[in-house]
Amino acid sequence: MKLRNYFLLSIVVGAAVACSSNEDIPEEHVFTPNATLSLATGVYGDGRTKAVGIDVSEEEEKENKIHTLDVLVFSGTGDDAVYQTQRRANETPLVPDIAVEAGSATIVVLANSSIDPKAFVTKKLSQVLEYTHSLKDETLDRGLSMSSKVIETNLTIDTHNIFGDANSFVGNHSPNEIKGGKIELYRHVAQVNLKSVKISTTNTGATFQLEEVFMANVKGYSHIASKKEYPNNWVEANAAPSGEKLWWYGDYFEDDWNGEYKITKDGVMIDFLAWTPETIEITKDAVLETENGKRAVASFYVYENLKETPVGQRTLLVLKGTYIDNNGKVEKDRFYTISVNDPNRGYTLTEGEDIPKHSFVKRNYRYNISLTINSSGSDRPYDPVTEACMDVAVTVADWDVIEQNEDLD
């Protein structure tokens, strides 16, 4: 592509601005395109799913799918870097030949974003990073939202500026400068998986009838990107958009259910944060385990909820059902409440190799939970009495670790 074409474009842009006299039109950064930007992206963890011999499920393929890519370019660096231009590409990890202005610049890449990038026109970087996604939009069909880190660079004039391999792009890209490698994208969600439920071997004769599994203290919004560097590139939101509610619940969201595990106010119930099966009966000899070819008994996408979170705002996985002891006593509506990845609850916590140590819910990780029932649970979902009734094992897994489930004999 000939760079002189972009010089002609700058004349057109300048003329359009000069001819406008509408004082209501917001002031835009008028830039002179005198270089191009081409970049390649990759989804963090996708390399494992493409490895030879790995059986990749349809679900895992969808988790890595890029439907849209938005490349946002800002002039300058820091919070006051001002919007320069953007490009949206569909169904591709490559975005070639974006007309840009040379000089100090900041780049942010968004995947599967629910926000029209035109909303960012005239905005500063700090303003753009305040935008949020909703957990309602995090579906496999539309694609999981992702973002790059905030990249500061210097774009060279009269040059094709490239992130990735120049040979990945069609056409002549000479002269060029490689500004960096392929840009990695990180999902905004974490995943909480219930892997198994069983009755303790010391609790012979007891039965638990599982009737519902739901999430609580889930943040319904996440920022679209972060300036923080990996592994602490948090996108946690601490407020909901105007008129919306930050804290979401699969069930029991009302304030009068509050206890030590739930101190939030004015929450909202969201159907997809609950799983209600036909009643499943669990005994010492009938363990509820993840089926072959499945990831979990029940699985939920959630947003980040970080280490400063008090006990009453930590993300929870709650099981509800009927407990029958070995004497036949029936106790309905019993709860087993698990504070996800909480080191202070006496759980067995296991972290995968090379995982940054953390004790909260962090994006792009899976939290795999196994529950052993020792006795009757609590009659309220958010009271800590449930801890004495169960043993919990939580495995923190990097997103790219694919578990190969064995056949259950």
Predicted regions and their residues:
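Extracytoplasmic cysteine-anchoring/structural motifs
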Residues: C19-D409
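Sec-dependent bacterial lipoprotein signal peptides
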Residues: M1-V17
